[in-house]
Amino acid sequence: MNAEPSAGPGIRVVTVPYSDPHVDAVLPEGVVRVGPAQGPSPWLDPAYLAAHAGGVDVVHLHSGYGHLPEDEVVSWAETLRRTGVPLVLTVHQLRDPQQATRRRHDAHLEALLATAEVVLTLTPGAADEIAERFGRTAIVVAHPSIAEPVPGLGAERGLVGLALRTPCAAVPDPAGLVRAALSGAVNGGGRLRVFLDDGVEPPPVFAAGDSLEYRPRKADSWPAQLQELHAVVLPECCGTHSPELEVCRDVGTRVVAPSCGWFADQWADVVTYDNDEERGLDPVSLDAAVAAALTRPAPRPADRAWRAEQRAAVRAVHAQVYAQVVADRAG
């Protein structure tokens, strides 16, 4: 890639999804984001893509395609190649935790990585995995800040959080997670707060008490709920990166992360426990990791000046990538 190109004003970029915290954080100033702002994005329809490709310069795919059958993503990639519009692909997940097996996502990645002009990802470990599995070189671009701490809102020392969302294959044993996290919290001199999404019931074997409480998880104030914790457990047995981890870095909450994926690459200051798709949850490991997390002071919220510099650098990389793929197409 040529040195230091900048995104010219008016480069028209389709972002899929149109908007989310990460997409908004990385989009350079001066770029024209092309809608419509709806989900699923109509740009994932090959017919829509073919009909409207003349009005855009770049398609940048982040996520939002996991629901599509394998052959539809292959057809979409073929259509994009025929239009000549360059694809920039950010690989957020190498194993989609929302899917029961890895087969569909692997097929999606194979088609998309074969089509993309430029591949981005969030950690060196993920870039190495992409090179090993798919033969593509990915540019590592850090996940930028997506939250700010609430002024004056303190954390309770020893308070551990665990969120139980809509049941999925990535969390096959929520009761086992609660049991091990509760044991670790108590062994570390603390207590456990379990957050429940709407419609999710607490595991029936655990009643609330002095060491265990249940709270509704509030999407609009989730960063503040995380800020009140000393530590939080990420429960998935599969996945690659976590935006929730970045929120915790921003607000100053320690993360207890599973051994799957590249969470420790994303933020070195995590405590890891054994939980992956092949071997499952090791409850003794989670118990010990939670207790160990409580022996350490909660991390300070990420320095806002450093986070602002990081975001500017991330946007500069995206501007450079967009300018380069547009120039390559014109040449």
Go through each PLM region and give its residues.
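Conserved catalytic-core segment of nucleotide-activated headgroup transferases in glycan assembly
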Residues: A155-V205
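Short hydrophobic beta-strand element within catalytic cores of glycosyltransferases
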Residues: R254-C260, A264
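Membrane-proximal helix-turn-helix segments that form the acceptor-binding/catalytic region
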Residues: S75-P86, Q99-V118
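A charged, aromatic-enriched C-terminal amphipathic alpha-helix characteristic of glycosyltransferases
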Residues: E277-A330
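Nucleotide-activated donor-binding/catalytic signature segment of Leloir-type glycosyltransferases, i.e.
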Residues: D198-A224, A231
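Donor nucleotide-sugar binding/catalytic pocket of nucleotide-sugar-dependent glycosyltransferases
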Residues: A114-A131, G135-V150
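Short N-terminal targeting/anchoring amphipathic segment
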Residues: P42, Y48-D71, V88-T90, P235
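Acidic donor-binding loop of glycosyltransferase active sites
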Residues: A224-T240, D250-T253
